[in-house]
Curated annotation (Swiss-Prot):
Part of the 50S ribosomal subunit. Contacts protein L32. One of its GO terms (biological process) is translation. Belongs to the bacterial ribosomal protein bL17 family. NCBIfam families: L17 (TIGR00059). One of its GO terms (molecular function) is structural constituent of ribosome. Keywords: Ribonucleoprotein, Ribosomal protein. The keyword Ribonucleoprotein applies. GO terms for cellular component: cytosolic large ribosomal subunit. It comes from Mycobacterium tuberculosis (strain ATCC 25177 / H37Ra). Gene3D superfamilies: Ribosomal protein L17. The gene is rplQ. This is Large ribosomal subunit protein bL17. Residues 134-180 are annotated as: Disordered. InterPro entries: Ribosomal_bL17, Ribosomal_bL17_CS, Ribosomal_bL17_sf.
Amino acid sequence: MPKPTKGPRLGGSSSHQKAILANLATSLFEHGRITTTEPKARALRPYAEKLITHAKKGALHNRREVLKKLRDKDVVHTLFAEIGPFFADRDGGYTRIIKIEARKGDNAPMAVIELVREKTVTSEANRARRVAAAQAKAKKAAAMPTEESEAKPAEEGDVVGASEPDAKAPEEPPAEAPEN
């Protein structure tokens, strides 16, 4: 059940705060990035991310839930047609807040909040590392049978190793798992 915000609100009453957040979210989805004060950006982030999560699901019920919050049908269409599918494989973290210099006049702390449009460098690097490790493992597995077939004739003539009951095969170092 939704609980009212305790303490100071953005600009006064709770209804005014809802209107501010709806307008900020509309501008964010329309333009991709907006410049606002830091407290407004911090309040907008979870609000906008919940709306994007609704858009990822894409059902009619989710569209109606978003239309309760955002009144602009064009922005809701953009949210469901473009923004939601773009973030389909991302679990949260759809927005980024970047602090900028304080506003002249009243020295209010300012920030830019924007939709994260690029893939993360670390996820691409991890994917490349996993692919390289899988290829190396496949290459090593393909090379192992040829080495064993070349080594078998030498082992058949070697009776000393076979007659010892406690003889152990040389241990191979464990295959390294790719780092995440």
